[in-house]
Amino acid sequence: MKIASIDIGTNAVKTKIFETGPTLIKFIQSERSPIRLGKEVFIEGQIPKEKLDQLVAILKNYKEIFESLEVRDYEIVATCAFRDTKNSEEARRFIEHSIEHPIRIISGLEEAKLMRLHPDAENNQTDMFVDLGGGSTEIFMREGSELAIGSFNLGAVRNMLGMDKPSEWKRLQRFLEKHKKPERIIGIGGNIRSFIYANNVKSMNQNKFLKSAQAMQSLSIEEKMDQFNFSPDRADVIDHAIIIFSFIMQKSGCKKIKSTKWGVSDSIAVKLFHEIYSQKIKIIN
């Protein structure tokens, strides 16, 4: 049985499709559609009608893909842009009625907690998982039997627009200083994947990371596109994302970072997988 998930993010909309069985979930394919909902949200306070129409068109296209592949069930979640927009409920209802499918707007802390579904997160006491999106940064870490989770209004698009607040940087610093020093950061999101891939490595130590970040910041948007084959909506925000990762590395004392292909859409699909197949379990009490 095929299932899918859709993540309506601040910089783009992403979907992933999976084949499943009672004990297996296997990735098949993905789609990404740049839309940058966060630009109007962070500057004007709400998502305009033309952007909602674009979003509807993207989601209808995804539905057609699902139908052609015989996807049985799927879930749609929206993150920071929908959390922050003044017309959140109105926008959600408009989208739901247009595509005839529910959308769930998840909180920053729920988004952070979803990282526990990453295959490497179970019983992992050494790594810090950092999901850096267009509008916010989520952190997940295990400390003994407790979970350390945080959500901060610092993101690649938000910071590019100069809408990040000093108080949020201070709050992030307090969080990092409060919790234990991780041995490694697992970076989630397209910016950190693109940055590490551009350096032709699988992981980087702090010194190499900071030097490479400085080198990339010296390049123009056009140079980033030419040298690394970045898309325009990656080239203009990647420096702002890497600045946040650099801050997290330095303030946490972490000396190593790697990226992962995992994202919100993967976690949502795994969550849906468990919900579907748990219904087939007979419970006796």
Feature names for model-found ranges:
Residues 17, 40-71, 79-117, 121-126, ...:
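Helical "lid/coupling" subdomains associated with nucleotide-phosphate turnover
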Residues 4, 17-20:
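Active-site neighborhood of HAD-like aspartate-dependent phosphohydrolases
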Residues 3-7, 127-131:
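Short glycine-aspartate micro-motif
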Residues 12-14:
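Short N-terminal binding/cap micro-motifs at the start of the first secondary-structure element
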Residues 135-141:
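Acidic, divalent-metal-coordinating active-site segment for phosphoryl/phosphodiester hydrolysis
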Residues 23-28, 146-148:
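Beta-strand initiation motifs
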Residues 34-35:
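Short, glycine-rich, amphipathic interfacial segments at transmembrane boundaries or analogous
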Residues 76:
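Dinucleotide-binding Rossmann-like beta1-alpha1 core, especially the glycine-rich loop
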